[in-house]
Amino acid sequence: MAGYLPPKGYAPSPPPPYPVPSGYPEPVALHPGPGQAPVPTQVPAPAPGFALFPSPGPVAPGPPAPFVPLPGVPPGLEFLVQIDQILIHQKAERVETFLGWETCNMYELRSGTGQQLGQAAEESNCCARLCCGARRPFRIRLADPGDREVLRLLRPLHCGCSCCPCGLQEMEVQAPPGTTIGHVLQTWHPFLPKFSILDADRQPVLRVVGPCWTCGCGTDTNFEVKTKDESRSVGRISKQWGGLLREALTDADDFGLQFPVDLDVKVKAVLLGATFLIDYMFFEKRGGAGPSAITS
């Protein structure tokens, strides 16, 4: 103000000991415009005694954990550890149904709760299927849902009948393929179908005893799984009745296999092989020779 004079005794304040900025600082370009170089983000230095941790972000996936096999369980048979029932469904083949031409059998396996366990496929030549019928030699490959072969069943050619103790049927069980874990051996009996469940050293572990008449009409046909001295039953192999038309026109059968949940996995696998052998011996029609249940 023109002509303003400070009052008497007024003295100006001394300057501060720190620099006084003049004007406003230039703003930091966090989002540079066109033609401007991006400004790197400045991370403040950590306070004394504190470490600086990186900000959370996507973590790169590491290598997969190595698979640890269960002790005493062949690789691929882990699905047998926690189950006590297997349902086996044989697929119906149209060529076999309408033309009577014997084809390789195909099966689906599920647990008692409906969980898919895998598929089994027969491998045999056409001449053996036509000439030997249900007695034909074959190889069955059982693959898990990932199409990995985990079990192999081998049946050699044995010509014989139940009325004499020669040419008894047999099946070898391998898991993994190439490693024998047991055998299924038919035991001679004049009236009853009997089988011995053997371990890799061909020592008996269990017995399977069937009924005198296996051609059940309207009911299931049960084969009891018993201890090796046949004193008590520990499981069952059941051929389930599929209906009059299906039983008369097709060879497609349904089986149920029951065993204790704490049974050795290898013995469970051999019992599975026994189920397939029973299907071929008693419920598979012979090529041009009538039902195998009469002559096996």
Curated annotation (Swiss-Prot):
Q: Where is this region: Disordered?
A: 1-45
Whether Transmembrane counts among this entry's keywords is yes
Q: Which UniProt keywords apply?
A: Apoptosis, Calcium, Lipid transport, Lipoprotein, Membrane, Mitochondrion, Mitochondrion inner membrane, Nucleus, Palmitate, Repeat, SH3-binding, Transmembrane, Transmembrane helix, Transport
Q: Which reaction does it catalyse?
A: a cardiolipin(in) = a cardiolipin(out); a 1,2-diacyl-sn-glycero-3-phosphoethanolamine(in) = a 1,2-diacyl-sn-glycero-3-phosphoethanolamine(out); a 1,2-diacyl-sn-glycero-3-phosphocholine(in) = a 1,2-diacyl-sn-glycero-3-phosphocholine(out); a 1,2-diacyl-sn-glycero-3-phospho-L-serine(in) = a 1,2-diacyl-sn-glycero-3-phospho-L-serine(out)
**Where can the motif SH3-binding 3 be found?**
66-71
Point to the regions of Pro residues compositional bias: 12-24, 35-45
- Give residue spans on the Mitochondrial intermembrane membrane side: 1-266
Locate the lipid attachment (S-palmitoyl cysteine): C159, C161, C163, C164, C166
Give the InterPro entries listed for this entry: Scramblase
The main location is mitochondrion
This chain belongs to which protein, by name?
Answer: Phospholipid scramblase 3
Membrane-spanning residues: 267-283
Report the PTM annotation: Palmitoylation regulates its localization to the cell membrane or the nucleus; trafficking to the cell membrane is dependent upon palmitoylation whereas in the absence of palmitoylation, localizes to the nucleus.
Instruction: Tell me where the sequence motif SH3-binding 2 sits in this chain.
Output: 21-27
Establish whether keyword Repeat is in the entry. Answer: yes
Q: What's its job?
A: Catalyzes calcium-induced ATP-independent rapid bidirectional and non-specific movement of the phospholipids (lipid scrambling or lipid flip-flop) between the inner and outer membrane of the mitochondria. Plays an important role in mitochondrial respiratory function, morphology, and apoptotic response. Mediates the translocation of cardiolipin from the mitochondrial inner membrane to outer membrane enhancing t-Bid induced cytochrome c release and apoptosis.
UniProt record similarity statement? Belongs to the phospholipid scramblase family.
Q: Which compartments does it reside in?
A: Mitochondrion membrane; Mitochondrion inner membrane; Nucleus
Q: Name one GO cellular component term.
A: mitochondrial inner membrane
Q: Which organism is it from?
A: Mus musculus
> Motif SH3-binding 1: which ranges?
7-15
Example of a GO biological process term:
mitochondrial membrane organization
Region (Proline-rich domain (PRD)) residue spans = 1-58
- A Pfam family annotated for this chain is Scramblase
